[in-house]
Structures are given as C-alpha cells and as structure tokens.
C-alpha cells in the first residue's frame, strides 16, 4: 500500500512548525518539550507526540486525536517531509524526531535569543500573528513572532509582539526604524526591557486592590455586619470609559462619521467571546436597557454597516468585542461620536479584570480601534444613582409595549438629539465633527 503524501502547502507548513519546535528560539523556553528531549536517551521525541500538538493537529486535520490515535500513514508522511530538513534528525524507523545538532547551554541560548528579539507595541487585540510577521519581514528575515498574553487576563493578547530576528545586528537595525502598523506608530525596545517591565506589572497586578465598593465586593459585602447599609442593587458591574486618541499627534475627538472608511485588519484567529445584543432583555433585571426604540436600533445597524471597518469611528459593537474578552457585557451605554460612555458586566469579576488590564497598560487604557479607552469605576453615590435611574425608568416604561417600554426616544429615556442629564444618565457631550 502506498504511503499518502502531504500536499505541498501542508508539507511546507508542517516542516516550518516542527523546525520551530526544535529551534534555538523555542526549545530552551519550551519546558515540556525540553524535558521530553532531556529524558530521551538519543535526544529524539515521538513523532506521534509532535503530531498531537494543537497546531500540528490543525495542519494535519486530525481533530482531537491524541498521540496514540495518530494514523500510522500520517506519521510516515510527516517523517518523509521532515527528512528534507537539515535542522532535524529522523530515526531509521521514521517514528522519532529531534535536532540534528546539540543544544547549547541554556543560559547562553536565552541570552542570544533576547539579544536578537525586539518587543514592538501597541498592536490591536485581534491582530494576527501572520500579519505581524509579514509586516516585519519587510525589514529582514523573521525567525519567529511571539504574542504574550496580558498579565491581568490570560485570554487576551497583551498588545506587545516579540519579534525574533536571525542576529542581534538585525534586531538593532529594526529598532532604528520609525515603523507604523495599521496607522499606529510602533514603540520598539529590546526584549530585556519588556521582560523587566512585565515583571513589574506582575507584581503590580498581584498587589492590585480595587476600590471599596468595586468589582470584587458584591452586594455591600463591605458592610456585611450591618444590613442597614447593604444596597439593594448589584455592586461592581458598572465602569465608565473615556475615549482618547491613541496616536500622539491625534486629538481626543472621534472623527466625523462622514469621513471615508479605512480597510480593517482581518479577523483574529481567536474571535472575541460572543456577547448578548444590547437590545435583548435581561431576565429579572432592568429591562429598560434592552428596550431601545426602532429608530435608535436602525441607526445603530446602519452605523455598523457603514463604519464597521472605519478605525476612526467607535461603535457599541467595537466596545463589546474588546471588553467581552473579560466577561459577559450586558449593556453598552454609548452613542457613536461621544467621548464617554458606560459598560455593564454580568459579573463583578469581569469589571475588575478589565480595570486591572487598563491600569497595567502602558497607554493607560485599552485599545479600541484608533482610540484608548481609559476606565474608571462607578461606585458609591454614582453607582446608586445609576441603578435608581434605571429602575425608575423601567417602572415608567412597563406601561408601554408589554414590559419592553413604549417609544422612549432611546436608551434611558434620552430624547433623540439630546444628551441632557435629565433624560439620560450618561452626561457625555457629543463630539462635533
């Protein structure tokens, strides 16, 4: 029976991936693979194990197969492909793989790796690794691109890409450049500086304590011994945000919605967590939030179709996509063109994670298109006022369309074209074009 061959594209991808696994760039810092190689008498590792790694399963279309479940003909096809590499060694039976040369001392390798690696930022949370690699390939060969997760939330990209070049000289040459990616001027620094800053961020996050009455204090737990002080609303779910231009030369205002749109970046490999639509009811909670009138809903849908790809216009959907990484976003109180708004999470822990991530960010907030969202907690009397207004509005609206409210002219009773505090808790001013 003939052994099936990999397609040319799959063979190239598999070869590159396995070479990376055993490279000077990865092996010294890959604890699992390094331990497996060290424990092997001949320095070779089961090829079935390598094929069971998540990326390899994807390339080979193996689904959730484990090492013992990898088809033998697939292993043989991969072995034939890897035999063409000068960096890899394949056992005679084609079932094991390893480096063709010995690994240098770990300390020396890490020092060399750091010297030829550049830390570049800021990148959007949904940027693709392939796009970053393609961008830097314009300035020299790229060995690898790493995208470390955020200190405050492991599911979120930190915004810093670690780009490794073949030599220290190559890295130094790149850091002398003035580079702009997707409209953002990049800050370039040695990886050692990034490592030092990250260590400080980890300590800062470990010592981070939210303000009293904030995210991790549910339902008045700070007064748990005195029921008279316990509020009758959930605490720590609301945060406010202010949008500021992320580019140094920009203003704090959003551009007019009449400006032409820019081509957006491709979707990330990991899409933002699904979040409920802003116009859905929240069972057992304030329903006025989800009861936007038809005109407001049409306006938002029209804006989404027109400005989805415009990096200079922030929509509610953009905010839900960014903050949905931290938890379920129940409602976004924001109108296109405004500088400020409010977010309500389903759980206080999500609010806490979002604020912690913003505190640790070099920009002082979280990137939303071409803007930085600077976060503040809504606590104390401000939080009480928010819930009081929502609930009073809910009672008023239940006289309308079957509990979803009559024609109110927008969120929280805001009349169209009005941002006055008398009708809407969000007192933000509209930004003139």
Swiss-Prot record:
xRRM domain mapped to chain residues: 298-419
Residue spans of biased composition, Basic residues class: 404-415
Cell compartments where the protein resides: Nucleus, Nucleoplasm; Nucleus, Nucleolus
UniProt keywords, alphabetically: Nucleus, RNA-binding
Polar residues: bias regions: 208-219
Keyword Chaperone in annotation: no
CDD domains: LA_like_plant, RRM1_La
Chain coiled-coil ranges: none
BP GO terms, sorted: embryo development ending in seed dormancy; ribosome biogenesis; rRNA processing; sno(s)RNA 3'-end processing; tRNA 3'-end processing
Tissue specificity comment: Expressed ubiquitously (at protein level).
InterPro entries: La_dom_prot, La_HTH, La_xRRM, Lupus_La, Nucleotide-bd_a/b_plait_sf, RBD_domain_sf, RRM_dom, WH-like_DNA-bd_sf
Residue ranges constituting the HTH La-type RNA-binding domain according to the UniProt record: 4-108
One Pfam family hit: La
Region of interest: Disordered: 206-233, 245-310, 395-433
Basic and acidic residues biased stretches: 255-283, 299-310
This protein's record includes keyword Nucleus: yes
GO MF, any single term: RNA binding
Ranges for domain RRM: 116-193
Principal location listed in the UniProt entry: nucleus
Gene Ontology annotations for the cellular component aspect, listed alphabetically: nucleolus; nucleoplasm; nucleus; plant-type cell wall; ribonucleoprotein complex
Effect of loss of the gene: Embryonic-lethal with deficient embryos arrested at early globular stage of development characterized by nucleolar hypertrophy.
Function: Binds to the 3' poly(U) terminus of nascent RNA polymerase III transcripts, protecting them from exonuclease digestion and facilitating their folding and maturation.
Record's protein name: La protein 1
Species the sequence originates in: Arabidopsis thaliana (Mouse-ear cress)
Gene name of the encoded protein: LA1
């Amino acid at each position: 029976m003939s052994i099936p061959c990999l397609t040319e594209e799959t063979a190239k991808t598999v070869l590159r991936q396995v070479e990376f696994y055993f490279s000077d760039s990865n092996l010294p810092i890959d604890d699992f693979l390094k331990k497996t190689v060290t424990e092997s008498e001949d320095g070779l590792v089961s090829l079935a194990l390598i094929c069971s790694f998540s990326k390899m399963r994807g390339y080979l279309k193996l689904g959730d197969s484990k090492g013992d479940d990898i088809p033998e003909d697939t292993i043989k096809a991969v072995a034939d492909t890897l035999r063409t590499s000068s960096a890899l060694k394949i056992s005679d039976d084609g079932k094991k793989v390893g480096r063709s040369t010995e690994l240098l001392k770990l300390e020396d390798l890490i020092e060399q790796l750091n010297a030829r690696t550049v830390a570049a930022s800021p990148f959007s949370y949904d940027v693709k690794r392939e796009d970053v690699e393609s961008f830097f390939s314009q300035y020299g060969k790229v060995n690898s691109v790493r995208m470390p997760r955020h200190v405050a939330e492991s599911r979120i990209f930190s915004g810093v890409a670690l780009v490794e070049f073949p030599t220290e000289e190559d890295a130094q040459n790149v850091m002398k450049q003035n580079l702009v990616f997707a409209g953002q001027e990049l800050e370039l620094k040695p990886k050692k500086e990034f490592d030092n800053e990250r260590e400080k961020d980890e300590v800062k996050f470990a010592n981070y304590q939210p303000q009293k009455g904030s995210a991790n204090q549910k339902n008045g737990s700070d007064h748990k011994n005195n029921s008279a002080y316990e509020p009758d609303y959930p605490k720590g779910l609301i945060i406010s945000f202010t949008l500021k231009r992320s580019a140094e030369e920009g203003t704090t205002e959003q551009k007019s919605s009449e400006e032409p749109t820019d081509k957006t970046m491709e979707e990330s490999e990991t899409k933002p967590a699904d979040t409920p639509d802003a116009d859905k009811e929240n069972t057992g909670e304030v329903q006025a939030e989800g009861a936007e009138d038809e005109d407001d809903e049409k306006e938002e849908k029209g804006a989404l179709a027109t400005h989805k790809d415009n990096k200079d216009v922030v929509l509610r959907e953009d905010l839900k996509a960014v903050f949905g990484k931290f938890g379920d976003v129940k409602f976004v109180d924001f109108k296109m063109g405004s500088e400020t708004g409010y977010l309500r999470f389903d759980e206080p822990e999500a609010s806490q994670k979002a604020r912690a991530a913003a505190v640790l960010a070099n920009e002082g907030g979280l990137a939303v298109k071409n803007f930085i969202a600077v976060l503040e907690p809504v606590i104390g009397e401000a939080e009480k006022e928010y819930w009081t207004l929502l609930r009073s509005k809910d009672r008023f609206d239940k006289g309308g369309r079957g509990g979803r409210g009559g024609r109110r002219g927008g969120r929280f009773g805001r009349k169209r074209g009005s941002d006055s505090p008398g009708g809407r808790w969000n007192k933000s001013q509209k930004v003139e074009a």
